[in-house]
Amino acid sequence: MRVISGSAKGTKLKTPDGLLTRPTSDRVKEAVFSIVQFEVQGSRFLDLFGGSGQMAIEALSRGAASAVIVDGRREACKLIGDNLRLTRLSDKAKVVQSDYLSYLGHCREVFDLIFLDPPYAEVFLENALKKISEIDILSDRGIIICERPAEKSLDMAIEGLTRGKDYRYGKTWITLFRKAGTEV
């Protein structure tokens, strides 16, 4: 796992042990940042299921102004901190050890890009989308990027959000959402 582009390009990131974290593949990561390439510079980035921190680190490396990386596990937060130090991006990031719903319940920040890649077997994705819409932390032109397995549907409508395009990369789907009333 490595940083693909930007100031930390080529830096190998530490990966988590065990099966609790499933890092986004380089192929999918590159595709995500190709899709949102014109939105990254100067953005405020939230990774709600941080894992290794690689998606926020990629955003920071490509010019995001700041990032918040949330993960409920102490080991994951330590690993994210290590990866931020490796890439020399610690000063632009905040690592929060918290359950995603607890974090959202107290969040007062607004983000331009929100990345959601929760454990595939859970309903975390749907719950996170609903909560994000309720608390209004997405900027007016912001984008929510959802990663999910090909076999998991995401057919629900979320009040306050407009669903954009779906992109398939092998066994992975990327789905975009924006605030209702904005162009997707």
Sequence positions of predicted segments:
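Class I S-adenosyl-L-methionine-dependent methyltransferase catalytic core
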Residues: M1-V184
